[in-house]
Design a protein with these regions (language model features):
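C-terminal substrate-binding/catalytic lobe of Rossmann-fold NAD(P)-dependent oxidoreductases
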Residues: 1-81
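NAD(P)-dependent Rossmann-like dehydrogenase/reductase catalytic/cofactor-binding core
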Residues: 64-66, 71-111
Length: 111
């Protein structure tokens, strides 16, 4: 079985990644999507039938990671394939540095 994603987008900024995740156990797709929606820095854009999915051109200047096109990965027993995009200057560098620092300060203060 094969799960494939092909994307051709000429952009100056922002990264896109096709990510495959394999779980140890079976999972419920709706529950997985609900859990992603609960995460503060993740925005779920996942309705391919209505052409709603993350594009690099939409995320420039934003801190969040945008996730979509979530589907079962049939090349493994319990897996998914998803498309993620983020502003690589903000999420890949500046915002991540601030978030890491906040976590370290929080741990030091016992939060």
């Amino acid at each position: 079985n094969i799960t494939a994603t092909c994307v051709r987008v000429p952009v100056l900024n922002c990264h896109g990644e096709s990510i495959n995740v394999e779980f140890e156990e079976e999972f419920d797709m709706q529950e997985l999507k609900q859990n992603l929606c609960r995460e503060e820095m993740i925005v779920l854009l996942d309705d391919p039938k209505k052409e709603i999915y993350p594009l690099q051109t939409f995320v420039d200047g934003k801190d969040e990671v945008f996730v979509g096109r979530i589907r079962r990965d049939y090349s493994v027993k319990s897996g998914i394939n998803m498309w993620c995009v983020a502003d690589n200057i903000r999420k890949g560098a500046a915002t991540n540095a601030v978030q890491i620092l906040e976590k370290l300060i929080g741990k030091r203060l016992g939060k």
